[in-house]
């Protein structure tokens, strides 16, 4: 496994994977959502200005401490929603990774076309799928990235912080 959204050139990595995919083969791809992670650059900026003498682990500890203090004083201030919050390495990766690319659905659509891959659908929670279907009852809309983009713009937290989807290489 690899992490495309942490590569210097994610499309180059994705192209390599698509290149070894057999005709008719399917691939599961996970990419950070620009809308879902919109608060991350703000958080990162607050802690990037911290003194360098504490290092990255010190910044992570300070971030987690401040978050928990905020949460105790205002329970509605839940900005995490991350299972990754409580381990040092996963919190560092989620909030402070030095290389991060975030995507919007139109970029995914463009990349799929460039790589000659067809979109097979998002791997989502049942509640998200049901909500989408209420707005877009035509079953074919599940495969239309433009419809998902409309939906996400109205529901910016729909995908959490990451898109997870399937695509196929044509036969």
Descriptions of predicted regions:
Residues 1, 29-32, 120-122, 168:
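Generic beta-strand/beta-sheet core signal
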Residues 1-11, 27, 33:
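A short SAM/SAH-binding and catalytic strip from SAM-dependent methyltransferases
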Residues 5, 34-36, 125-129:
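Short, solvent-exposed loop/turn segments at secondary-structure junctions
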Residues 11-24:
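A short glycine-rich, Lys/Arg-flanked "PGG" loop and its adjoining helix->strand segment in the class I
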Residues 13, 53, 144-145:
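Helix N-terminus capping/helix-initiation residues
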Residues 17, 46-50, 124:
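Short, low-complexity, polar/charged sequence segments that are solvent-exposed and flexible
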Residues 26-78:
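Conserved class I S-adenosyl-L-methionine
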Residues 66-171:
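Rossmann-like AdoMet/SAM-dependent catalytic core
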């Amino acid at each position: 496994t690899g992490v495309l959204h942490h590569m210097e050139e994610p499309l180059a990595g994705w192209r390599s994977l698509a290149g070894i995919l057999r005709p008719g083969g399917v691939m599961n791809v996970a990419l950070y959502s620009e809308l879902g992670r919109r608060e991350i650059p703000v958080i990162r900026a607050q802690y990037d200005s911290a003194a360098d003498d504490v290092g990255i682990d010190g910044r992570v500890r300070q971030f987690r401490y401040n978050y928990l203090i905020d949460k105790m004083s205002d329970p509605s201030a839940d900005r995490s929603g991350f299972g990754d919050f409580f381990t040092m390495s996963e919190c560092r990766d989620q909030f402070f990774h030095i290389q991060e690319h975030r995507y919007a659905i139109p970029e995914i659509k463009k990349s799929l076309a460039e790589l000659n891959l067809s979109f097979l659908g998002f791997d989502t929670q049942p509640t998200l799928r049901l909500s989408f279907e209420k707005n877009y009852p035509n079953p074919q809309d599940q495969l239309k990235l433009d419809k998902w983009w409309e939906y996400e713009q109205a529901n910016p937290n729909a995908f959490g912080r990451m898109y997870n989807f399937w695509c196929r290489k044509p036969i």
